[in-house]
Every structure is written in structure tokens, then in C-alpha cells.
Amino acid sequence: MRLVFAGTPRAAVPSLVRLHASGHEVALVVTRADAPTGRKRQLTPSPVAREAEGLGIPTLRTNRLDEEATARIAAVGAGLGVIVAYGGLVREPLLSTPARGWINLHFSLLPRWRGAAPVQRSIMAGETVTGASVFRLERGMDTGPVFAVEERPTGAHETAGDVLHALAMQGADLLVRTVDGIAAGSAVARPQEGEPTLAPKTSIADGRIDWARPADAVLAQIRGVTPEPGAFTSVDDVRVKVHRAAELRDAAPLDPGRIESVGGAVMVGTTSHPVELIQVQPAGKKPMPAADWWRGVTTRDITAR
């Protein structure tokens, strides 16, 4: 079947690769326009754009799915549109442009976590199971009927980046099987069931650690915003990113935010047991072991805020 693929970030690349290697033809790739990255703010193609170029697939780089983009997509004559984290909404008349409409690979167990940050919000909420869903795109945000779902347990130490990478691989296979079923006429989409939850895009504010919560909630927050937007706290008015942390269930309690070093472990108090800081990054410096950072802190009676 002739396809149009729309996607932008690294998480969408496995799906593009698997579809290209299948018996289907990816006739056009739609991705976001080149964006400034790095300290020099150089315009850089998206991961999907780079992969499409390597595969020899024509690309449409645009941030607006307007009339011009719709005409370009319609000219391809695709039977089906496939979206994986493109980064924009598909509206009419583009929604009806491919003969069989559009399907979307979403990294959650719909209807849970509809929105831009399903993996991050699932981890931040303390959930231990997530997954991938392939559904038919319609006007509502992630509300369409579902063709296929696969669950995946979330490891106790996995970050959002870890889980998203795993789901990108698992979801790519699920997506190809769904496209196969649609082409064969055997795929069936069923309405979503259950209470929906929303997963709005994470912001820098989501990364500020609130130590006045139990340790498991603090660790879930850190894992959920790693690598982006990143967890952080303020120590002596200096922002310190927290890349890795762990539970210390047997340690003596500390007041929320209180920092102490015991036996080489740098601990921060919560409303339950302390959390051990393993890897941190003070503002303007590279990531380092928390013990190395602590040796450079001159004030010992301090609180993380």
C-alpha cells in the first residue's frame, strides 16, 4: 500500500524504518521544518528528515499543514497516512485526503494519557505499566477508535527517555502489523473504553523537584522528566540538575529538602525516607557524581528548594 508518513523526533524513526522495509511504499515523509539547535543555533533537520534522506524518500518539511501542504500530500495519491509524533494537528481537508484516512501510533494505553507527553506523565504519576496504541485519527485529540494495543512494564529505574526508546521499537512493529491488516481488509478499530486522562506537554516548571512529598513521588518526578525537560533543585541559589537518584529506605529521616552526606552518600530529605543523589549537574558545569559536587559545596547547613 502507498503511504504518507508524518513524524519528527527520534522516537518516530523506528516506525519509518520498519515501514520502509515492509512491503508497503512510503511515498512521502512529512516532518517539521529544520530548527535551530545547539549553542550556535544552527538550523538542523529533524531525526526523521535525516533518516528519510538516507532512505531516499522525498520529504516535505513544514510546520503548517495548510492548503499547500495538503495539495502536496494529495498529489502523492497515498492510500493511507501514518503519523508518529509529527508535532502538529491534522485537520480537514487533510484528514480525509488519503483514501483510507490516517492512523496514529501513540505511546500510551489509550484512553489513558491523551496528549503530547504520555510517557512522561505516566511515569510521573507512578504508573508501572504503559504501552503503545495504534488508532484511527479523527478531529478529537487522540480520541479515535483503536486498532491495536500492546502493554509494556515500566522498570523501577527507567527514565522517560528509556521507556520512550523501548516503546518506539515495540510500537514500530505494532504499527506495521496494523498497516498490514488495513491493507488486507482485516483490521478492526474499536472505540476507546475507560476514563481518559490527559498528558499535556511538559515544561521547565515540571522539572522543579518538590521535596515536600514522599520519596517515591520525588523519584517518579525525576525519572519522568529525564532527559527532558530535566529535574532540578536550587542549592544556595544555584540551580542543580538531578540526572540520577535512588531510594534510601533504611536511612534515618531528614526534613524535606535537607541535604546531608552519610558514608559517602549525598542524601536529601523528603516526607518519607531520604533520596540519594547519584549524578547531578550544577549550573554551568558538566554532569558529575553527587559526591564530587558535595565536596565542592562550602556550606553544610543547607536545604534544597
From Swiss-Prot:
SUPFAM superfamilies: FMT C-terminal domain-like, Formyltransferase. (6S)-5,6,7,8-tetrahydrofolate binds at S108, L109, L110, P111. It catalyses: L-methionyl-tRNA(fMet) + (6R)-10-formyltetrahydrofolate = N-formyl-L-methionyl-tRNA(fMet) + (6S)-5,6,7,8-tetrahydrofolate + H(+). Its EC number is 2.1.2.9. One of its GO terms (molecular function) is methionyl-tRNA formyltransferase activity. Keywords: Protein biosynthesis, Transferase. GO terms for cellular component: cytosol. It holds the Pfam family Formyl_trans_N. Belongs to the Fmt family. Attaches a formyl group to the free amino group of methionyl-tRNA(fMet). The formyl group appears to play a dual role in the initiator identity of N-formylmethionyl-tRNA by promoting its recognition by IF2 and preventing the misappropriation of this tRNA by the elongation apparatus. PANTHER family: METHIONYL-TRNA FORMYLTRANSFERASE, METHIONYL-TRNA FORMYLTRANSFERASE, MITOCHONDRIAL. NCBIfam families: fmt. This is Methionyl-tRNA formyltransferase. The gene is fmt.
